[in-house]
């Protein structure tokens, strides 16, 4: 996959303020505030920054955490996992493999078949219905 690289100023001009804060500055949207938290529409969730496919709606589940949750990405190559030791916690951050947009975190408390919960900020996603 060819990387998409832009300066922070280029990203700022392309994204709205909340998208920029979350995707480029590793912010987090408020729980239960994102437009995809309760969405059940069939489709594919793409990266808001580069349009790379990230998650299939078939892998989405209601975790009750306040953010869209998925038990697996659309492909292992779609994202990169990074150890995150911010805020006094040890977590695993997930970023888009193509453009390095911060997406959220993955936790080992999800449902079968993977046991994983990808907890993703809605503002980082664009749902393309089937």
UniProtKB/Swiss-Prot annotation:
Cofactor(s) this protein requires: Zn(2+)
Residues at the catalytic site: 119
Keyword Coiled coil: no
Enzyme Commission number: 1.8.4.12
Pfam family of the protein (one): SelR
Keyword Zinc: yes
Gene Ontology annotations for the cellular component aspect, listed alphabetically: cytoplasm
A GO molecular function held by the record: peptide-methionine (R)-S-oxide reductase activity
Keyword tags: Metal-binding, Oxidoreductase, Zinc
Catalytic reactions of this protein: L-methionyl-[protein] + [thioredoxin]-disulfide + H2O = L-methionyl-(R)-S-oxide-[protein] + [thioredoxin]-dithiol
Cofactor note: Binds 1 zinc ion per subunit. The zinc ion is important for the structural integrity of the protein.
Gene Ontology annotations of biological process type: protein repair; response to oxidative stress
Superkingdom in the source lineage: Bacteria
InterPro entries, sorted: Met_Sox_Rdtase_MsrB, Met_Sox_Rdtase_MsrB_dom, Mss4-like_sf
Boundaries of every MsrB domain copy: 8-130
Binding residues for Zn(2+): 47, 50, 96, 99
Similarity field: Belongs to the MsrB Met sulfoxide reductase family.
NCBIfam families (alphabetical): peptide-methionine (R)-S-oxide reductase MsrB
The protein, known as: Peptide methionine sulfoxide reductase MsrB
Originating species: Pseudomonas fluorescens (strain ATCC BAA-477 / NRRL B-23932 / Pf-5)
Lineage start: Bacteria, Pseudomonadati, Pseudomonadota, Gammaproteobacteria, Pseudomonadales
């Amino acid at each position: 996959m060819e990387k998409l690289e832009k300066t922070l100023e280029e990203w700022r001009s392309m994204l709205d303020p909340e998208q920029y804060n979350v995707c480029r500055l590793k912010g987090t949207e408020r729980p239960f505030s994102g437009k995809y938290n309760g969405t059940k529409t069939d489709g594919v969730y793409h990266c808001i920054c580069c349009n790379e496919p990230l998650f299939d709606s078939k892998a989405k589940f209601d975790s009750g955490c306040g953010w869209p949750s998925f038990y697996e990405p659309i492909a292992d190559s779609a994202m990169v996992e990074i150890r995150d030791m911010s805020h006094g916690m040890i977590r695993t951050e997930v970023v888009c493999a193509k453009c390095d947009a911060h997406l959220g975190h993955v936790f080992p408390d999800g449902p079968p078949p993977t046991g994983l919960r990808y907890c993703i900020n809605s503002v980082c996603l664009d749902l393309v219905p089937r």
